C-alpha cells in the first residue's frame, strides 16, 4: 500500500505544480487572472464608451465642439494623379512616358549636348528636326487609307481627283514651258540683233580702214612719181629750153589727175 498523503499536501497539489528545480508555479493565480479578464471584458468596454460619451457631452456643454474623429479612425484619402490626361484617337493617354534603359541614356545624352533643362524641350527639338519625315509618314498613311477604301465609288472619285490633279499639273507645266520658250525666243532675238549690229559696225570699220589704206598708197605713189620725174629732168638736155620743160610738167600733171580720178572712183565703188 502507498502511504497516504496529508490533506494539506493534496490541497496544495491541486493548486500548484512543483517544477524540477523545486519552485512552485501557482496555477490558480494564472487561471483566476484569465477568468477575470474574460468575464469582465463587456463591462470594461461599456464603461469605456460611457466615459467617452460623458467627456464628449462635457465638451459640448462647455462650448468646446471638438471633432470626435480621433476616437473613430478613418481611412486615408487616396492621392490623386496630378498629371492631366491627354485625349487622343486611341483614348486618354498619360503624359508620363516610361523609357527603356538604352533609350533613356541616349535621350539624356542628347539633352546634355543641347543644354536643355527639361525633357519636353528636347522632344520639341527632335520633333522640329523630323518634320519632313513626319510629313512623308502622314502622306503615306493618307495614300494607304485612300487605296485601301472598300467603296468603288470612293476609288473612282479618288481616281478622278488624281486625273484632275495630273491635268492641272500638266497645264501648269505647259504654261511654264511656254513662258520659258517665249523668254528664250526674246533673248535669242535680242542676241541676233546685237550680233547683226556688231557685224555692220565691223563692216564700216573695215571700209574706213580700206579707204585710209588706199589713200596712203596713192600718196606714196605720187611722191615716188615726183621723185622719178625730177631725176629725168636733170638728165634731159635743154634743146628747146622752156617749151620742153613745160611739156614735161603738163604731162606729169595730167597723169596725176587721171590717177586720182581712178582712185576716187574705186573708193566710191567700195563705199
From Swiss-Prot:
Residues 64-85 are annotated as: Disordered. Residues 79-137 form the TCP domain. Involved in the dorsovental asymmetry of flowers. Retards growth rate and reduces organ number in the dorsal region of flowers. PANTHER family: TRANSCRIPTION FACTOR TCP1 (PTHR31072:SF224), TRANSCRIPTION FACTOR TCP4-RELATED (PTHR31072). Keywords: Developmental protein, DNA-binding, Nucleus, Transcription, Transcription regulation. GO terms for cellular component: nucleus. Pfam families: TCP. Residues 192-209 form the R domain. GO terms for molecular function: DNA-binding transcription factor activity; sequence-specific DNA binding. The gene is CYC. This is Transcription factor CYCLOIDEA.
Amino acid at each position: 500500500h502507498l502511504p497516504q498523503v496529508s490533506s494539506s499536501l493534496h490541497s496544495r497539489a491541486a493548486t500548484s505544480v512543483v517544477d524540477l528545480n523545486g519552485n512552485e508555479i501557482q496555477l490558480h493565480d494564472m487561471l483566476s487572472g484569465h477568468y477575470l479578464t474574460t468575464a469582465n471584458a463587456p463591462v470594461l468596454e461599456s464603461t469605456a464608451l460611457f466615459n467617452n460619451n460623458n467627456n464628449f457631452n462635457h465638451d459640448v456643454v462647455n462650448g468646446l465642439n471638438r471633432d470626435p474623429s480621433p476616437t473613430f479612425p478613418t481611412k486615408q484619402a487616396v492621392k490623386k494623379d496630378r498629371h492631366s490626361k491627354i485625349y487622343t484617337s486611341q483614348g486618354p493617354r498619360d503624359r508620363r512616358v516610361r523609357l527603356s534603359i538604352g533609350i533613356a541614356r541616349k535621350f539624356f545624352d542628347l539633352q546634355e549636348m543641347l543644354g536643355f533643362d527639361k525633357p519636353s524641350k528636347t522632344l520639341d527639338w527632335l520633333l522640329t528636326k523630323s518634320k519632313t519625315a513626319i510629313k512623308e509618314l502622314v502622306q503615306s498613311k493618307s495614300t494607304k487609307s485612300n487605296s485601301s477604301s472598300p467603296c468603288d465609288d470612293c476609288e473612282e472619285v479618288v481616281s478622278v481627283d488624281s486625273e484632275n490633279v495630273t491635268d492641272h499639273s500638266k497645264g501648269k507645266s505647259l504654261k511654264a514651258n511656254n513662258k520659258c520658250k517665249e523668254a528664250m525666243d526674246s533673248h535669242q532675238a535680242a542676241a541676233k540683233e546685237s550680233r547683226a549690229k556688231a557685224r555692220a559696225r565691223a563692216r564700216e570699220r573695215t571700209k574706213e580702214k580700206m579707204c585710209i589704206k588706199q589713200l596712203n598708197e596713192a600718196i606714196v605713189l605720187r611722191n615716188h612719181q615726183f621723185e622719178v620725174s625730177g631725176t629725168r629732168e636733170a638728165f634731159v638736155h635743154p634743146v628747146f629750153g622752156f617749151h620742153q620743160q613745160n611739156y614735161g610738167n603738163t604731162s606729169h600733171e595730167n597723169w596725176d589727175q587721171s590717177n586720182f580720178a581712178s582712185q576716187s572712183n574705186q573708193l566710191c565703188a567700195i563705199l
